[in-house]
Amino acid sequence: MNDIELKTIARDGKARLNEVTLNNKNFQTPLFMPVATRGALKSLPFNYLEDTDIILANTYHLYLRPGLEVIKEFGGLHNFIGWNNIILTDSGGFQGWSIPNKFNDDGIEFKNIYDGSKFFMDPTLSMDIQQTLNSDIAMILDSLIDINKEYDEQLNAIQTTKNWALKAREHHSNSNQSLFGIVQGGKHKELREKSATDMLSLDFNGYAIGGLAIGETQQERKEIVDFTVEMLPQDKLRYVMGLGDIEGMLDLIELGVDIFDLSLIHISEPTRLRRISYAVFCLK
């Protein structure tokens, strides 16, 4: 795994402005990551994002099309799409929730959305795909379930996520790639605490808070994030997955969150967030 250098240069309560260095590339947080699902933005050229530091690409979709052999011929995703800044790849966990599938303790059986065939994604395959893509930041495969599921189901999901995280951590071997753990647990603070403890024990390069923006109220989300952030280390990035509206991001920036993403968002939002973040921290 590749360490991320993080320096907090300004604070406003729990909110923080960080200078971050990864693979000789520098960026500041808080930031929003535009989602380039298959390595491209819909209806927009990459030069539209010339001032953007990070994009998110989708492991599930890139694995299916164009496929790893094509991307491998280019030496990785950066060269394939002509992107010189940072790429974060998700693991396939969200598609495990959003696309009809079958979960078991070993992984997720998917139906290929292009041809209907079935394939099985487990923690090691997810790592193999992301290491072949050679993204700067990879995510572990996690067990994402509806936030309103019962306690026992949430408990099983965090145990599965822990087991998958351990397998991913052991399998990961790309020294140029950072690896993030994911904290799950639904609305239950004791499960969020247990999941955070599980992730911290594996000493990842950064930590995501997952399972949000899929059914909870705004107040519930703030309480979950506030509680969880307090358990995460100051010297690691904090990433709330799947949230990218301005009001929602500002709520969580105030609680110390650094990174956000959302596929269903107007492309002008990241630029607006950047302006707001400068105002929040009164840099001048």
Range-by-range predicted roles:
Residues 1-173:
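Non-catalytic, usually N-terminal nucleic-acid engagement modules in DNA/RNA processing proteins
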Residues 34-38, 60, 92-94, 143, ...:
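Active-site beta-loop-alpha junctions enriched in small/polar residues
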Residues 51-52, 134-135, 199-207, 233-235, ...:
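Glycine-enriched alpha-helix->loop->beta-strand junction motifs that scaffold or abut catalytic
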Residues 86, 174-181, 231-241:
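Short beta-strand/loop segments at the ligand-binding rim of alpha/beta enzyme cores
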Residues 132-136, 160-179, 184-214:
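Alpha/beta enzyme core
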Residues 190, 194-197, 245-257:
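Catalytic cores of alpha/beta
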Residues 243, 257-264, 268:
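Short helix/strand-capping turn motifs
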Residues 265-284:
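Single conserved hydrophobic/aromatic residue that forms the stacking wall/gate
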